[in-house]
């Protein structure tokens, strides 16, 4: 990360507080260059660094990145192994810089399937940055939106089984309290790179009223200009949340 400076000169005052990004296109980017897919994933790490720096510089409250879905285990073993090793190396190389710049790192998803080595890196990184109060950086790893909802439902079912909760008392609020990111500001904007127009099982609960922004730019080519363009496009949207009157939900 580069040093964080406050700079909102080129952005609308109606910028989102919480942005989530589906980082798509690493494989195609590598293929276009005649390289193996892992080459694209390595290049994508640089885009992560740029995105985090931009988010912190422009005072976003939270940035959530879709790094590895629960469906990605179906990819070739060689690619999965390379991704896991890249994850370890990225944590080792980036966490001190994140901490220096007051970023709080959280990994959301079912990390139990990861190697003990990777789980230890995750715990160590989260612990180091736990007390930081700057940008909240969430990395979704072995994450799926359906999994997230199911694990929340299971917590409620356990409460019902123990007699601590009546089924009739189950509400959106009670389920939300067990869903990932519930303690953070709601997701305002979802950006997907790579040209596909779908959500891919990402934050299904959390993005109910988020604005969606799709770009053909492949993730390794994602830079500050593309990010700024997405935020400025967001500023032109009228968010109604099911009503008829536009609501400025980004106001703190």
Curated annotation (Swiss-Prot):
One of the record's GO molecular function terms: magnesium ion binding
Binding residues for Mg(2+): 24, 197, 211
Known partners and oligomeric status: Homodimer.
Biological function: Catalyzes the sequential condensation of isopentenyl diphosphate (IPP) with (2E,6E)-farnesyl diphosphate (E,E-FPP) to yield (2Z,6Z,10Z,14Z,18Z,22Z,26Z,30Z,34E,38E)-undecaprenyl diphosphate (di-trans,octa-cis-UPP). UPP is the precursor of glycosyl carrier lipid in the biosynthesis of bacterial cell wall polysaccharide components such as peptidoglycan and lipopolysaccharide.
GO cellular component: cytosol
Substrates-to-products reaction catalysed: 8 isopentenyl diphosphate + (2E,6E)-farnesyl diphosphate = di-trans,octa-cis-undecaprenyl diphosphate + 8 diphosphate
Family indicated by similarity: Belongs to the UPP synthase family.
Name of the protein this chain belongs to: Ditrans,polycis-undecaprenyl-diphosphate synthase ((2E,6E)-farnesyl-diphosphate specific)
Enzyme class: transferase
Source organism (scientific name): Yersinia pestis
Alphabetical list of Gene3D superfamilies matching this protein: Decaprenyl diphosphate synthase-like
């Amino acid at each position: 990360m580069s040093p964080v400076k406050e700079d909102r000169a080129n952005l609308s005052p109606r910028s989102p507080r919480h942005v989530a990004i589906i980082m798509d296109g690493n494989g195609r980017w590598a293929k276009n260059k005649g390289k193996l897919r892992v080459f694209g994933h390595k290049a994508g790490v640089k885009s992560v660094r740029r995105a985090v720096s931009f988010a912190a510089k422009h005072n976003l409250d939270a940035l959530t990145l879709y790094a590895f879905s629960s469906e990605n285990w179906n990819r070739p073993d060689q690619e999965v192994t390379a991704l896991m090793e890249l994850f370890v190396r990225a944590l080792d190389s980036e966490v001190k810089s994140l901490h220096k710049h007051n970023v709080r790192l959280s990994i959301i998803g079912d990390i139990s399937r990861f190697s003990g080595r990777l789980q230890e890196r995750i715990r160590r990184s989260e612990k180091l940055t736990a007390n930081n109060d700057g940008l909240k950086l969430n990395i979704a790893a072995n994450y799926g939106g359906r999994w997230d909802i199911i694990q929340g439902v299971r917590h409620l079912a356990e409460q019902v089984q123990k007699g601590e909760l009546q089924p009739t008392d189950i509400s959106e609020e009670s389920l939300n309290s067990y869903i990932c990111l519930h303690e953070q500001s709601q997701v305002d904007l979802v950006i997907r790179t790579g040209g596909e127009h779908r959500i891919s099982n990402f934050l299904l609960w959390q993005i109910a009223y988020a604005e969606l922004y799709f770009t053909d730019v492949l993730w390794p080519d994602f830079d500050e200009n593309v990010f700024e363009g997405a935020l400025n496009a967001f500023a032109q949207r009228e968010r109604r949340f099911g009503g008829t009157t536009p609501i400025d939900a980004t106001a703190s």
